[in-house]
Amino acid sequence: MDTNNNIEKEILALAKQKVSPIEYENCLSQLKYNPNASKSDIAFFYAPNTLLCNWITAKYGTLLKEILSQNKVGMHLAHSVDVRIEVAPKIQISTQSNINYKATKMSVKDSYTFENFVVGSCNNTVYEIAKKVAQSDTPPYNPVLFYGGTGLGKTHILNAIGNHALEKHKKVVLVTSEDFLTDFLKHLDNKTMDSFKAKYRHCDFFLLDDAQFLQGKPKLEEEFFHTFNELHANSKQIVLISDRSPKNIAGLEDRLKSRFEWGITAKVMPPDLETKLSIVKQKCQLNQIILPEEVMEYIAQHISDNIRQMEGAIIKISVNANLMNASIDLNLAKTVLEDLQKDHAEGSSLENILLAVAQSLNLKSSEIKVSSRQKNVALARKLVVYFARLYTPNPTLSLAQFLDLKDHSSISKMYSSVKKMLEEEKSPFILSLREEIKNRLNELNDKKTAFNSSE
């Protein structure tokens, strides 16, 4: 037996001692150690599917990290070890030559395609733009920037573009801004920048995820600026993904903001109920998990718009049913998902509410704090009041001061205005906007909680 198999067996044996036999059999036993990707400070594992990958990461990621950090298990490990779990790649038989093939599909995940992307009224525009870009021999728009909240399918659509381009034998580079930075620093230290430039500038499709993280890194922004210019000048397709629109990426150089807006910018909206139900059904089908119709409807209605959280809900129900040897019904689902339905927006600060509203409406926070006749600013101010009344203990006086309102009675009017749009008029736009702002608040509050717990 080779060393890598020994390492995998030793890791799993240690993990088996920490969990119940059923948990080990259903979850951890299916992990495969990936020696090629692993390094001294990071260990990579494969899981057989996306649902199990996400579940093990959330439920057992910390446990695996502790095991690897405290035991050598045949590896030359650093003091602190990170753990990454990915979906196992499908083995494909190539019908073409192998010349530079690995370089042409850098980091593209073949499980994300146009065929398994669930299309609804919330994302149809983004889907059509992405398909046109992927199918065209020359860029129809350049660059393309898709933006929106976490877990709405942006990364899926980016990989779908990459996979379609690969089918046409195009050279594709898909990278996160974090990995772009890491690679940049490595080549800079090794004085091999010519190799770095060749890697990222000689491709047909350059696909960048998390573009907002370029900001605040002058040397990286400078290199990306020149990479962008050369790709654009040579009519190579550039597609960017961000969690906010270019003008709202604080700290990003103006010249990059300008270039991001050269082509077309489209927002990925939160899914409506019908689309959410379609997503839940698809995730169940792909991972061979059978849920009753009423349970799938319950997930769509009560779990947030974040697709990853919906996946997590499906996994949680399935795994708990297996552990308890129980049949899946609505009562089980309600019990298992109780903690996922808690509103993390409770106790939000005024600053977080302001930021969440600003990001959702593509405004700057400073614009919202000043009274304006512009419709989008006026709506934003009303939404800040609405969410502040829902989620903060701040009295009317402090809220009025926060928004520079001289007439404190305006607070009640602004709150009532939003409530009317939601409850009486049932404006689809305002309803969708409310969910997006809540999702952003959840993310901001979760980040704060994680930061505080690490102190």
From Swiss-Prot:
It is found in: Cytoplasm. The keyword Nuclease does not apply. Residues 107-321 are annotated as: Domain III, AAA+ region. Keywords: ATP-binding, Cytoplasm, DNA replication, DNA-binding, Lipid-binding, Nucleotide-binding. GO terms for biological process: DNA replication initiation; regulation of DNA replication. InterPro entries: AAA+_ATPase, Chromosome_initiator_DnaA, Chromosome_initiator_DnaA-like, Chromosome_initiator_DnaA_CS, DnaA_C, DnaA_dom, DnaA_N_sf, P-loop_NTPase. The keyword Iron-sulfur does not apply. It holds the Pfam family Bac_DnaA. ATP binds at residues 151, 153-155. Residues 75-106 are annotated as: Domain II. Its main location: cytoplasm. PROSITE patterns: DNAA. One of its GO terms (cellular component) is plasma membrane. Residues 322-455 are annotated as: Domain IV, binds dsDNA. GO terms for molecular function: ATP binding; ATP hydrolysis activity; DNA replication origin binding; lipid binding. Plays an essential role in the initiation and regulation of chromosomal replication. ATP-DnaA binds to the origin of replication (oriC) to initiate formation of the DNA replication initiation complex once per cell cycle. Binds the DnaA box (a 9 base pair repeat at the origin) and separates the double-stranded (ds)DNA. Forms a right-handed helical filament on oriC DNA; dsDNA binds to the exterior of the filament while single-stranded (ss)DNA is stabiized in the filament's interior. Domain I is involved in oligomerization and binding regulators, domain II is flexibile and of varying length in different bacteria, domain III forms the AAA+ region, while domain IV binds dsDNA. Oligomerizes as a right-handed, spiral filament on DNA at oriC. Belongs to the DnaA family. This is Chromosomal replication initiator protein DnaA. It comes from Helicobacter pylori (strain HPAG1). The gene is dnaA.
